């Protein structure tokens, strides 16, 4: 039976390392010796069948596999009876208290033993296939993926295959060439024949691909991986010369100017492109060439297919400037760099420099790398350099960190949202005012955050490797990952400050002030001096004109680092609380930070009064954070036009059932779009309720808040959980991400703040 293992790792292995005893690590293992009871097996099968039956209605899984395990291990039984509120009935303080206690008791029960909250953080259909591609090429597919792994990966593909045979870029999206080609190749590499698979999965996918022009219409990223696999020719891709790494770092086209994720994808790809690496052309690869292309492989004019992209995949078309640049490099620059003498000197020097940076990034992240797109590319680059090398073996030891199991099957995560979910969840629990009842939960969560803070900067001379400092920050996931994140740091800092005001006998010893100062230093470093907005990973400042060179047809704003409303708002809240407790530490800088950050948030407000959410869906998410930041800075409905307009947006967006609901289409279209039929979701409703409470709506007319909370209370499930509904996360405008814990965190937080701040009858 599958089991989720927490904070475990082989400490005797020479290939795996940890900075904090694996705190936050979460890996799935199949234990053939685990004696599952008939009841356990029945629960798991019921969850799988329920998802499969409703898979076209609710795309994100409820993430039940580990929840069933944890609740069973803790023998959790919900003892607080459910409450429902009738249409004309008032919500009393007693009713609100019961709802809060039910949600808090369930949420506490699903905390891991190291203090964090596990959860799925997946959704893109292109995360897992490159792991399969890489392991197939290197000959380690069967060693890493057991029969049980393959079974669950196929289950995931079957569950998320659309009725037309294709897969989207993400689980909610329409069928795309990118998702469908990746899904098809994955099924074939895992052992299915061309006409195998549940409900003719392979044949249906292949038909979709060929009906939409064949594999030559796959977007640029897909062309790269297919060239590596031997299903495409490098001559059919855009140039990615490694020589850019040899330029001065201040040069506008040096990768140092790129957003970190973009830079770390380009890094191994430029190495593989520079070597023109192609995996072994096996009989299966030769079969796939015939199956995926609509004309004989040897007759394809590769030069002409470089700019092709299937219409369903095209969100961000290439600019004329970009196409001229690609063509210039393809026709002039690359032929020079690949001929003597430059191929013997300059190209080899560039490849050596690129590999040096790959090793630096691998070592800095304990061979986890920054994310799931980068991981298989860096792992493959290490194998190409030395198939029996230590670096590749260290990569293999961290592959399992990326895989997640749900009732819909096995998928790959971004890496994990351990710290982010924990920081938000702890604030929701703190708002409950139930310290005596949930003290152990709070203490464990506090302990996790203290152990998860990044204590050092990246190894060695990090500035020459184009890295920002990380000491004092928190990551999105765990400490071993090492990549600093501004809003994760701000939300974790808020938690630690709140815990510092509580009894150490209850929540443990408070964090040392010097570590708080380190966190403050990091946040201050990422504010844009011109706009006042806060970046996420590294300083923003590279020319936005570089976005014209975005080669990824289905994503936007990924070439350079930007500033974001949500991150800025989180930092304001953290600094206001920090300033209260440490009024003399960097006072002038913090005061100036808050003033400029408020101006930035006000400037970013849209015409309808909302704020665009860059990391959550979408205008409801962004508005909740923006209103919270403005309110923390002392802005009110009476002295701030932005708050008045934000409230007006939320009130107009409320649905007839009292809740709120927003379509993921808001993100790519950049226009607020309600769900079909103006349906509501518990997460969007909670975000709107929190936003209205931040803005002081209860002081004017609490009716909209009461209606929203009534929707939340009546949506509560028997055991204290909330229903999984629409997907809630996003990145780069057009790719959705499933934050499975949001359905617990935000409704609990909204109920708790409602009980604390909205006057209710006894």
From Swiss-Prot:
PFTB repeats lie at residues 100-142, 150-191, 442-486, 516-562, 594-634, 643-684, 705-746. CDD domains: SQCY_1. This is Tirucalla-7,24-dien-3beta-ol synthase OSC2. GO terms for molecular function: beta-amyrin synthase activity. Keywords: Isomerase, Repeat. It catalyses: (S)-2,3-epoxysqualene = tirucalla-7,24-dien-3beta-ol. Its EC number is 5.4.99.56. Mainly expressed in roots, bark, wood, stems and petioles and, to a lower extent, in older leaves. Signal peptide: none annotated. Gene3D superfamilies: 1.50.10.20. SUPFAM superfamilies: Terpenoid cyclases/Protein prenyltransferases. The active site is at residue 487. The keyword Repeat applies. One of its GO terms (cellular component) is lipid droplet. Pathway: Secondary metabolite biosynthesis; terpenoid biosynthesis. It comes from Ailanthus altissima. InterPro entries: SQ_cyclase_C, SQ_cyclase_N, Squalene_cyclase, Terpene_synthase_CS, Terpenoid_cyclase/PrenylTrfase. It is an enzyme of class 5 (isomerase). PROSITE patterns: TERPENE_SYNTHASES. Pfam families: SQHop_cyclase_C (PF13243), SQHop_cyclase_N (PF13249).
